[in-house]
Design a protein with these regions (language model features):
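Conserved ABC transporter NBD signature motif
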Residues: 60-79
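H-loop (His-switch) and adjacent beta-strand-loop-beta switch element
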Residues: 217-230
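Catalytic Walker B motif of ABC-type/P-loop ATPase nucleotide-binding domains
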Residues: 168-172
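Conserved ABC ATPase "signature" region
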Residues: 105, 120-139
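Conserved ABC ATPase signature
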Residues: 143-147
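Helix-to-loop junction immediately C-terminal to a conserved catalytic motif
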Residues: 52
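H-loop/switch region of ABC-family ATPase nucleotide-binding domains
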Residues: 204-205
Length: 255
């Protein structure tokens, strides 16, 4: 039986007494790549943040690597160190004076460490390897604030790959990228998932890219409306259930 890296059971999140996410249950097997899709306001980002313990949930349970998320979002440090989260907007970018190499090094440091430190040769070697794996070696001495959107996304993946991790959560990672940069990002993400053994949960509006790259799809509109492989979950009939009548499905393209 496949190992379940993430298990969500009957999760409900309320804001001001209103259910934003209601009774959601699913599980992610090790090394799977699952997309979370749905219309604007469906609760996708809220669900992701509740799973990570950033937002509180009112009922249900989340288990990461077999360990339950505490009532205040607590996870053992050994589990937290195996998670990585790429938010929709990277607000640190424009005010962060760190070089790319120093920023990626923060991904190596123990959770909770507040200041960058250069540490051991092992850490420096891990940073160099992460930059090579993500094609960022030539950016090592650049400031984060000097990077383009596509470069920043690659550096964020270097941050994730600098130490072994099991679960990577992305919230609209393609936001702000043109079609070429988005395709390059997803190609790199696909390669890293296979080489690093990541399990991925990604919020996405790019249904065509989801169809091409993901193993499974969760369709959310406050509650989980359908789930399954892309050919099932992204069929016109299922998309109408999630997005409403009159929704125009994406057009199929082939590489």
């Amino acid at each position: 039986m496949a190992e379940m890296v993430l298990e969500v059971s009957d999760l409900t999140v309320r804001r001001e007494g209103v259910s934003v996410v209601e009774s959601v249950s699913f599980a992610l097997a090790a090394e799977s790549d699952t997309a979370l899709v749905g219309p604007n306001g469906a609760g996708k980002s809220t669900l992701v943040q509740a799973i990570l313990g950033i937002l509180p949930h009112q009922s249900g349970q989340v288990r990461v690597l077999g360990r339950p998320l505490g009532p205040k979002g607590q996870l053992p440090a050994s589990v937290r160190a195996q998670l990585a989260y790429l938010p929709q907007s990277f607000s640190v970018r424009n005010r962060c004076p760190l070089s790319v190499a120093d920023f990626v090094g923060l991904g190596w440091d123990p959770p909770g460490l507040q200041l960058p430190w250069r540490g051991s040769e092992r850490r420096r070697q891990a940073v160099r390897q992460a930059l090579v794996k993500t094609g960022c070696s030539d950016l090592a001495d650049r400031l984060i604030s000097e990077l383009s959107g596509g470069q920043t996304k690659r550096v964020l993946l270097a941050f994730c790959v600098v130490r072994p991790r099991r679960l990577l959560v992305l919230d609209e990672a393609q936001a702000g990228l043109d079609s070429q940069a988005a395709e390059q990002f997803y190609g790199l993400l696909f390669d890293l998932r296979r080489s690093e053994g990541w399990t991925i949960l990604q919020v996405s509006h790019d249904l065509e890219m989801v169809r091409l790259t993901c193993d499974g799809v969760l369709c959310l509109n406050r509650s989980l409306r359908c789930s399954g492989p892309p050919d099932h979950a992204l069929s016109p009939a299922q998309l109408e259930r999630v997005y409403g009548r009159g929704y125009v499905p994406y057009h199929h393209h082939h590489r």
